[in-house]
Protein backbone atom coordinates (compact mmCIF):
# COMPACT_ATOMS: atom_id res chain seq x y z
CA UNK A 1 0.00 0.00 0.00
CA UNK A 2 2.86 2.29 0.64
CA UNK A 3 4.10 1.80 -2.89
CA UNK A 4 0.86 2.82 -4.59
CA UNK A 5 1.32 6.60 -4.32
CA UNK A 6 4.79 6.29 -5.60
CA UNK A 7 3.59 4.20 -8.50
CA UNK A 8 0.81 6.67 -9.19
CA UNK A 9 3.27 9.50 -9.06
CA UNK A 10 5.51 7.64 -11.42
CA UNK A 11 2.60 7.02 -13.81
CA UNK A 12 1.52 10.64 -13.59
CA UNK A 13 5.04 11.72 -14.37
CA UNK A 14 5.12 9.46 -17.35
CA UNK A 15 1.83 10.90 -18.60
CA UNK A 16 2.60 14.58 -18.21
CA UNK A 17 6.35 14.67 -18.02
CA UNK A 18 6.66 17.14 -15.13
CA UNK A 19 9.39 15.32 -13.27
CA UNK A 20 12.81 17.03 -13.23
CA UNK A 21 15.23 15.88 -15.88
CA UNK A 22 18.42 14.48 -14.38
CA UNK A 23 21.58 16.43 -15.23
CA UNK A 24 23.26 15.31 -18.45
CA UNK A 25 26.34 13.10 -18.29
CA UNK A 26 29.59 14.28 -19.79
CA UNK A 27 29.42 13.96 -23.52
CA UNK A 28 31.92 12.11 -25.61
CA UNK A 29 31.68 14.90 -28.19
CA UNK A 30 32.93 17.95 -26.30
CA UNK A 31 32.85 20.11 -29.38
CA UNK A 32 29.14 19.59 -29.80
CA UNK A 33 28.34 20.13 -26.09
CA UNK A 34 30.34 23.29 -25.44
CA UNK A 35 27.44 25.62 -26.06
CA UNK A 36 24.93 26.15 -23.24
CA UNK A 37 22.27 23.95 -21.74
CA UNK A 38 23.90 20.64 -22.45
CA UNK A 39 22.26 20.70 -25.87
CA UNK A 40 23.96 19.65 -29.06
CA UNK A 41 24.29 21.61 -32.25
CA UNK A 42 22.91 19.98 -35.33
CA UNK A 43 23.05 21.33 -38.83
CA UNK A 44 22.06 18.09 -40.51
CA UNK A 45 18.51 19.11 -41.39
CA UNK A 46 19.36 22.23 -43.30
CA UNK A 47 22.35 20.64 -44.90
CA UNK A 48 20.25 17.67 -45.89
CA UNK A 49 17.79 19.86 -47.78
CA UNK A 50 20.59 21.81 -49.38
CA UNK A 51 22.36 18.64 -50.50
CA UNK A 52 19.11 17.32 -51.97
CA UNK A 53 18.67 20.52 -53.95
CA UNK A 54 22.24 20.37 -55.25
CA UNK A 55 21.83 16.79 -56.37
CA UNK A 56 24.16 14.97 -54.04
CA UNK A 57 23.91 13.74 -50.44
CA UNK A 58 26.79 13.72 -47.97
CA UNK A 59 24.79 12.20 -45.10
CA UNK A 60 26.34 8.71 -45.31
CA UNK A 61 29.82 10.12 -45.25
CA UNK A 62 29.00 12.37 -42.31
CA UNK A 63 27.40 9.50 -40.39
CA UNK A 64 30.36 7.30 -41.09
CA UNK A 65 32.57 9.66 -39.12
CA UNK A 66 30.58 9.02 -35.91
CA UNK A 67 30.59 5.92 -33.70
CA UNK A 68 27.91 3.33 -34.50
CA UNK A 69 25.69 4.36 -31.60
CA UNK A 70 26.05 8.04 -32.42
CA UNK A 71 25.27 7.38 -36.07
CA UNK A 72 22.10 5.51 -35.11
CA UNK A 73 21.05 8.30 -32.78
CA UNK A 74 21.67 10.90 -35.47
CA UNK A 75 19.56 8.91 -37.93
CA UNK A 76 16.71 8.63 -35.42
CA UNK A 77 16.89 12.32 -34.62
CA UNK A 78 16.87 13.19 -38.32
CA UNK A 79 13.69 11.19 -38.69
CA UNK A 80 11.98 12.94 -35.74
CA UNK A 81 12.78 16.52 -36.76
CA UNK A 82 12.21 16.19 -40.49
CA UNK A 83 9.17 18.51 -40.18
CA UNK A 84 11.37 21.47 -39.12
CA UNK A 85 11.64 24.57 -41.24
CA UNK A 86 14.30 24.40 -43.97
CA UNK A 87 15.40 27.89 -43.05
CA UNK A 88 16.61 26.88 -39.59
CA UNK A 89 20.35 26.69 -39.72
CA UNK A 90 20.89 25.39 -36.19
CA UNK A 91 18.90 22.62 -34.57
CA UNK A 92 19.10 21.98 -30.81
CA UNK A 93 17.88 18.95 -28.96
CA UNK A 94 18.39 17.76 -25.36
CA UNK A 95 20.93 15.15 -24.51
CA UNK A 96 18.28 13.01 -22.82
CA UNK A 97 16.49 12.67 -26.11
CA UNK A 98 19.75 11.71 -27.73
CA UNK A 99 20.30 9.01 -25.09
CA UNK A 100 16.74 7.75 -25.37
CA UNK A 101 17.07 7.39 -29.11
CA UNK A 102 20.33 5.56 -28.66
CA UNK A 103 18.74 3.22 -26.08
CA UNK A 104 15.79 2.52 -28.38
CA UNK A 105 18.12 1.64 -31.20
CA UNK A 106 19.70 -1.00 -29.02
CA UNK A 107 21.80 -1.10 -25.87
CA UNK A 108 24.55 -3.11 -27.40
CA UNK A 109 27.61 -0.99 -28.08
CA UNK A 110 26.09 2.11 -26.49
CA UNK A 111 28.83 4.16 -24.75
CA UNK A 112 26.20 5.46 -22.29
CA UNK A 113 24.87 2.04 -21.27
CA UNK A 114 26.56 2.22 -17.87
CA UNK A 115 24.54 5.36 -17.08
CA UNK A 116 21.27 3.64 -18.03
CA UNK A 117 22.21 0.58 -15.93
CA UNK A 118 22.95 2.80 -12.94
CA UNK A 119 19.58 4.53 -13.34
CA UNK A 120 17.81 1.17 -13.40
CA UNK A 121 19.57 0.22 -10.18
CA UNK A 122 18.10 3.30 -8.46
CA UNK A 123 21.13 5.61 -8.59
CA UNK A 124 21.25 9.05 -10.26
CA UNK A 125 23.77 10.92 -12.36
CA UNK A 126 24.80 12.98 -9.35
CA UNK A 127 26.99 10.13 -8.19
CA UNK A 128 29.19 10.71 -11.22
CA UNK A 129 29.86 14.34 -10.32
CA UNK A 130 30.61 13.50 -6.68
CA UNK A 131 33.72 11.65 -7.76
CA UNK A 132 36.97 13.53 -7.20
CA UNK A 133 37.91 15.44 -10.37
CA UNK A 134 40.99 14.40 -12.20
CA UNK A 135 43.99 16.64 -11.83
CA UNK A 136 44.78 18.86 -14.82
CA UNK A 137 47.72 17.59 -16.87
CA UNK A 138 50.93 19.43 -16.26
CA UNK A 139 52.41 20.77 -19.47
CA UNK A 140 56.18 21.15 -19.65
CA UNK A 141 57.47 24.00 -21.80
CA UNK A 142 61.22 23.66 -22.37
CA UNK A 143 63.07 26.92 -21.88
CA UNK A 144 65.52 28.40 -24.34
CA UNK A 145 68.34 28.49 -21.79
CA UNK A 146 70.01 25.16 -21.16
CA UNK A 147 71.18 23.98 -17.79
CA UNK A 148 74.80 24.56 -18.77
CA UNK A 149 74.06 28.20 -19.61
CA UNK A 150 72.16 28.63 -16.35
CA UNK A 151 75.13 27.30 -14.43
CA UNK A 152 77.41 29.58 -16.38
CA UNK A 153 75.22 32.60 -15.59
CA UNK A 154 75.14 31.74 -11.90
CA UNK A 155 78.90 31.32 -11.88
CA UNK A 156 79.35 34.68 -13.64
CA UNK A 157 77.08 36.32 -11.08
CA UNK A 158 79.31 35.09 -8.28
CA UNK A 159 82.42 36.37 -10.07
CA UNK A 160 81.23 39.97 -10.52
CA UNK A 161 83.25 42.60 -8.70
CA UNK A 162 86.69 44.12 -8.68
CA UNK A 163 89.22 41.48 -9.60
CA UNK A 164 92.54 42.87 -10.75
CA UNK A 165 93.92 41.09 -13.77
CA UNK A 166 90.58 39.60 -14.78
CA UNK A 167 87.70 40.75 -16.93
CA UNK A 168 84.65 40.81 -14.70
CA UNK A 169 81.93 40.64 -17.36
CA UNK A 170 82.44 36.91 -17.88
CA UNK A 171 84.29 34.24 -15.89
CA UNK A 172 87.96 33.75 -16.71
CA UNK A 173 88.80 30.69 -18.81
CA UNK A 174 85.16 29.63 -18.95
CA UNK A 175 85.01 28.86 -15.23
CA UNK A 176 86.95 25.60 -15.66
CA UNK A 177 83.71 23.67 -15.18
CA UNK A 178 82.94 21.83 -18.44
CA UNK A 179 86.02 19.94 -19.51
CA UNK A 180 88.38 22.85 -18.81
CA UNK A 181 91.12 22.58 -16.25
CA UNK A 182 92.90 25.42 -14.48
CA UNK A 183 96.46 26.13 -15.65
CA UNK A 184 99.12 24.45 -13.56
CA UNK A 185 102.87 24.77 -13.32
CA UNK A 186 104.72 22.53 -15.76
CA UNK A 187 107.55 21.77 -13.35
CA UNK A 188 107.80 18.16 -12.33
CA UNK A 189 105.94 17.53 -9.08
CA UNK A 190 104.71 21.12 -8.67
CA UNK A 191 101.28 21.24 -10.31
CA UNK A 192 100.49 24.51 -8.58
CA UNK A 193 97.08 25.98 -9.39
CA UNK A 194 97.62 29.23 -11.30
CA UNK A 195 93.99 30.38 -11.32
CA UNK A 196 94.74 33.29 -9.00
CA UNK A 197 98.31 33.90 -10.23
CA UNK A 198 99.47 36.72 -12.49
CA UNK A 199 98.50 36.69 -16.12
CA UNK A 200 102.12 36.16 -17.22
CA UNK A 201 102.43 33.01 -15.10
CA UNK A 202 99.05 31.68 -16.23
CA UNK A 203 99.92 32.24 -19.88
CA UNK A 204 103.28 30.45 -19.74
CA UNK A 205 102.18 27.84 -17.18
CA UNK A 206 104.91 28.40 -14.64
CA UNK A 207 104.63 29.46 -11.04
CA UNK A 208 106.55 32.41 -9.68
CA UNK A 209 108.99 30.21 -7.76
CA UNK A 210 110.04 28.06 -10.73
CA UNK A 211 110.21 31.07 -13.07
CA UNK A 212 113.16 32.35 -10.98
CA UNK A 213 114.69 29.05 -9.89
CA UNK A 214 118.21 28.29 -11.28
CA UNK A 215 117.41 24.62 -11.94
CA UNK A 216 113.96 23.14 -12.61
CA UNK A 217 113.18 19.50 -13.31
CA UNK A 218 110.54 19.39 -16.03
CA UNK A 219 108.67 16.52 -17.63
CA UNK A 220 111.01 13.75 -18.66
CA UNK A 221 113.52 14.49 -15.90
CA UNK A 222 115.29 17.29 -17.83
CA UNK A 223 117.19 19.89 -15.85
CA UNK A 224 116.20 23.24 -17.34
CA UNK A 225 115.87 26.91 -16.49
CA UNK A 226 113.12 29.36 -17.36
CA UNK A 227 114.33 32.04 -19.79
CA UNK A 228 112.81 35.42 -19.06
CA UNK A 229 113.48 36.65 -22.61
CA UNK A 230 111.99 33.66 -24.43
CA UNK A 231 109.39 32.92 -21.70
CA UNK A 232 110.07 29.19 -21.87
CA UNK A 233 112.38 26.57 -20.43
CA UNK A 234 115.86 25.96 -21.90
CA UNK A 235 118.58 23.48 -21.08
CA UNK A 236 121.24 24.66 -18.68
CA UNK A 237 123.88 24.62 -21.45
CA UNK A 238 122.19 27.60 -23.13
CA UNK A 239 122.76 29.90 -20.14
CA UNK A 240 125.88 31.72 -18.98
CA UNK A 241 126.53 31.11 -15.27
CA UNK A 242 123.47 32.17 -13.29
CA UNK A 243 121.90 34.38 -15.97
CA UNK A 244 118.12 34.31 -16.17
CA UNK A 245 118.14 34.74 -19.96
CA UNK A 246 119.60 32.42 -22.55
CA UNK A 247 122.87 33.25 -24.27
CA UNK A 248 121.36 34.08 -27.66
CA UNK A 249 118.64 36.43 -26.49
CA UNK A 250 120.96 38.11 -24.03
CA UNK A 251 123.48 38.83 -26.81
CA UNK A 252 120.72 40.38 -28.93
CA UNK A 253 119.64 42.48 -25.99
CA UNK A 254 123.18 43.75 -25.36
CA UNK A 255 123.69 44.49 -29.07
CA UNK A 256 120.64 46.70 -29.09
CA UNK A 257 121.88 48.56 -26.05
CA UNK A 258 125.41 49.01 -27.45
CA UNK A 259 124.51 50.62 -30.72
CA UNK A 260 127.18 53.11 -31.98
CA UNK A 261 126.49 56.61 -30.73
CA UNK A 262 128.24 59.83 -31.98
CA UNK A 263 131.27 60.67 -29.84
CA UNK A 264 131.55 63.92 -27.90
CA UNK A 265 134.44 65.18 -30.10
CA UNK A 266 132.48 64.71 -33.31
CA UNK A 267 129.47 66.34 -31.76
CA UNK A 268 131.48 69.37 -30.65
CA UNK A 269 133.13 69.65 -34.11
CA UNK A 270 129.76 69.66 -35.82
CA UNK A 271 128.58 72.30 -33.40
CA UNK A 272 131.58 74.49 -34.15
CA UNK A 273 131.09 74.16 -37.90
CA UNK A 274 127.49 75.17 -37.56
CA UNK A 275 128.45 78.25 -35.53
CA UNK A 276 131.11 79.21 -38.12
CA UNK A 277 128.60 78.95 -40.96
CA UNK A 278 126.17 81.07 -39.01
CA UNK A 279 128.74 83.80 -38.33
CA UNK A 280 129.83 83.83 -42.00
CA UNK A 281 126.25 84.31 -43.08
CA UNK A 282 125.82 87.25 -40.69
CA UNK A 283 129.05 88.84 -42.00
CA UNK A 284 127.88 88.52 -45.60
CA UNK A 285 124.63 90.23 -44.72
CA UNK A 286 126.48 93.09 -42.96
CA UNK A 287 128.88 93.56 -45.94
CA UNK A 288 126.06 93.76 -48.46
CA UNK A 289 124.27 96.37 -46.36
CA UNK A 290 127.46 98.49 -46.04
CA UNK A 291 128.05 98.32 -49.82
CA UNK A 292 124.55 99.53 -50.46
CA UNK A 293 125.08 102.40 -48.02
CA UNK A 294 128.43 103.36 -49.73
CA UNK A 295 126.81 103.43 -53.15
CA UNK A 296 124.09 105.67 -51.82
CA UNK A 297 126.63 108.05 -50.26
CA UNK A 298 128.68 108.18 -53.49
CA UNK A 299 125.59 108.93 -55.51
CA UNK A 300 124.68 111.78 -53.16
CA UNK A 301 128.25 113.15 -53.38
CA UNK A 302 128.11 112.95 -57.17
CA UNK A 303 124.88 114.90 -57.23
CA UNK A 304 126.32 117.52 -54.89
CA UNK A 305 129.44 117.85 -57.08
CA UNK A 306 127.32 118.20 -60.19
CA UNK A 307 125.36 121.00 -58.56
CA UNK A 308 128.59 122.82 -57.63
CA UNK A 309 129.88 122.29 -61.15
CA UNK A 310 126.82 123.82 -62.74
CA UNK A 311 127.12 126.84 -60.45
CA UNK A 312 130.81 127.29 -61.35
CA UNK A 313 130.05 126.99 -65.04
CA UNK A 314 127.38 129.63 -64.77
CA UNK A 315 129.81 131.95 -63.04
CA UNK A 316 132.48 131.29 -65.71
CA UNK A 317 130.07 132.01 -68.54
CA UNK A 318 129.03 135.23 -66.89
CA UNK A 319 132.69 136.24 -66.65
CA UNK A 320 133.24 135.31 -70.31
CA UNK A 321 130.36 137.49 -71.39
CA UNK A 322 131.86 140.47 -69.53
CA UNK A 323 135.25 139.93 -71.18
CA UNK A 324 133.69 139.58 -74.64
CA UNK A 325 131.69 142.76 -74.23
CA UNK A 326 134.85 144.56 -73.26
CA UNK A 327 136.81 143.23 -76.29
CA UNK A 328 134.11 143.52 -79.00
CA UNK A 329 131.24 145.75 -78.03
CA UNK A 330 129.88 145.75 -81.62
CA UNK A 331 129.20 142.02 -81.89
CA UNK A 332 127.21 141.91 -78.68
CA UNK A 333 124.14 140.32 -80.19
CA UNK A 334 125.99 137.51 -81.93
CA UNK A 335 128.08 136.83 -78.85
CA UNK A 336 124.98 136.66 -76.66
CA UNK A 337 123.46 134.09 -79.02
CA UNK A 338 126.60 131.97 -78.91
CA UNK A 339 126.75 132.27 -75.15
CA UNK A 340 123.13 131.10 -74.83
CA UNK A 341 123.87 128.08 -77.00
CA UNK A 342 126.94 127.26 -74.90
CA UNK A 343 124.97 127.70 -71.71
CA UNK A 344 122.26 125.33 -73.04
CA UNK A 345 124.87 122.69 -73.90
CA UNK A 346 126.41 122.90 -70.44
CA UNK A 347 123.02 122.45 -68.78
CA UNK A 348 122.32 119.45 -71.03
CA UNK A 349 125.57 117.79 -69.98
CA UNK A 350 124.85 118.45 -66.33
CA UNK A 351 121.47 116.69 -66.71
CA UNK A 352 123.20 113.70 -68.29
CA UNK A 353 125.45 113.48 -65.23
CA UNK A 354 122.38 113.33 -62.97
CA UNK A 355 120.93 110.34 -64.90
CA UNK A 356 118.56 112.14 -67.30
CA UNK A 357 119.76 111.46 -70.87
CA UNK A 358 118.89 114.10 -73.45
CA UNK A 359 119.64 114.17 -77.18
CA UNK A 360 122.68 116.10 -78.24
CA UNK A 361 122.03 119.74 -79.24
CA UNK A 362 123.72 122.12 -81.61
CA UNK A 363 125.76 123.57 -78.76
CA UNK A 364 127.84 120.38 -78.59
CA UNK A 365 128.76 120.78 -82.24
CA UNK A 366 129.63 124.47 -81.99
CA UNK A 367 131.83 123.98 -78.92
CA UNK A 368 133.99 120.85 -79.24
CA UNK A 369 136.32 122.23 -76.65
CA UNK A 370 133.41 122.54 -74.22
CA UNK A 371 132.86 118.76 -74.53
CA UNK A 372 136.43 118.27 -73.40
CA UNK A 373 135.76 120.57 -70.51
CA UNK A 374 132.65 118.59 -69.64
CA UNK A 375 134.59 115.33 -69.83
CA UNK A 376 137.15 116.82 -67.50
CA UNK A 377 134.34 117.70 -65.14
CA UNK A 378 133.13 114.07 -65.34
CA UNK A 379 136.55 112.84 -64.35
CA UNK A 380 136.60 115.44 -61.61
CA UNK A 381 133.23 114.12 -60.37
CA UNK A 382 134.58 110.58 -60.29
CA UNK A 383 137.58 111.86 -58.36
CA UNK A 384 135.19 113.56 -55.97
CA UNK A 385 133.45 110.26 -55.32
CA UNK A 386 136.75 108.48 -54.77
CA UNK A 387 138.36 111.20 -52.63
CA UNK A 388 136.36 112.16 -49.55
CA UNK A 389 138.23 115.46 -48.95
CA UNK A 390 135.95 118.44 -49.53
CA UNK A 391 138.86 120.90 -49.84
CA UNK A 392 140.40 118.86 -52.64
CA UNK A 393 137.10 118.96 -54.51
CA UNK A 394 136.82 122.73 -54.14
CA UNK A 395 140.39 123.25 -55.41
CA UNK A 396 139.74 120.99 -58.39
CA UNK A 397 136.62 122.97 -59.25
CA UNK A 398 138.55 126.24 -59.12
CA UNK A 399 141.16 124.90 -61.57
CA UNK A 400 138.45 123.73 -63.93
CA UNK A 401 136.77 127.12 -63.76
CA UNK A 402 140.03 128.87 -64.65
CA UNK A 403 140.51 126.52 -67.60
CA UNK A 404 137.02 127.18 -68.82
CA UNK A 405 137.59 130.96 -68.54
CA UNK A 406 140.79 130.70 -70.57
CA UNK A 407 139.04 128.59 -73.21
CA UNK A 408 136.30 131.16 -73.53
CA UNK A 409 138.81 133.99 -73.97
CA UNK A 410 140.67 131.90 -76.59
CA UNK A 411 137.44 131.40 -78.52
CA UNK A 412 136.77 135.13 -78.52
CA UNK A 413 140.24 135.88 -79.83
CA UNK A 414 139.90 133.17 -82.50
CA UNK A 415 136.64 134.65 -83.75
CA UNK A 416 138.18 138.07 -84.17
UniProtKB/Swiss-Prot annotation:
SUPFAM superfamilies assigned to the protein according to its UniProt record, in alphabetical order: SBT domain (SSF103612)
The function of this protein is: Probable transcription factor that plays an important role in building the laminar joint between leaf blade and leaf sheath boundary, thereby controlling ligule and auricle development.
Alphabetical keyword list: DNA-binding, Metal-binding, Nucleus, Transcription, Transcription regulation, Zinc, Zinc-finger
Task: Give the organism, scientific name.
Answer: Oryza sativa subsp. indica (Rice)
Region spans: Disordered: 11-53, 250-299
Please name the PROSITE patterns in this protein's record. Answer: ZF_SBP
Give one GO molecular function term: zinc ion binding
What is this protein's record name? Squamosa promoter-binding-like protein 8
Q: Tell me the domain comment.
A: The SBP-type zinc finger is required for the binding to DNA.
> Which gene name does the record give?
SPL8
Specify where it is mainly localized: nucleus
Q: Taxonomic lineage of this organism? A: Eukaryota, Viridiplantae, Streptophyta, Embryophyta, Tracheophyta
User: Quick one: which residues bind Zn(2+) 2?
Assistant: 227, 230, 234, 246
Question: Which parts of the sequence form the motif Bipartite nuclear localization signal?
Answer: 243-259
Amino acid sequence: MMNVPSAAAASSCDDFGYNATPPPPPSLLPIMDQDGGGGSIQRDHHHHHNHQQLGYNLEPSSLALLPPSNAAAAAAHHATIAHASPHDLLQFYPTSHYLAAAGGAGGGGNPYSHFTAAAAAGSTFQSYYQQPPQAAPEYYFPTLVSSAEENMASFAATQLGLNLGYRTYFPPRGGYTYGHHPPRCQAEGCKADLSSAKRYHRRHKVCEHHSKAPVVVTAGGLHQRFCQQCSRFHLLDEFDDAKKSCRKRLADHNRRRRKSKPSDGEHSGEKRRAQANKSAATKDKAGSSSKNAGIGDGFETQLLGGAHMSKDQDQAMDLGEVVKEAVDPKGKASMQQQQQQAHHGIHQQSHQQHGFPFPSSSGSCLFPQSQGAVSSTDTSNIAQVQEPSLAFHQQHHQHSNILQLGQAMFDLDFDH
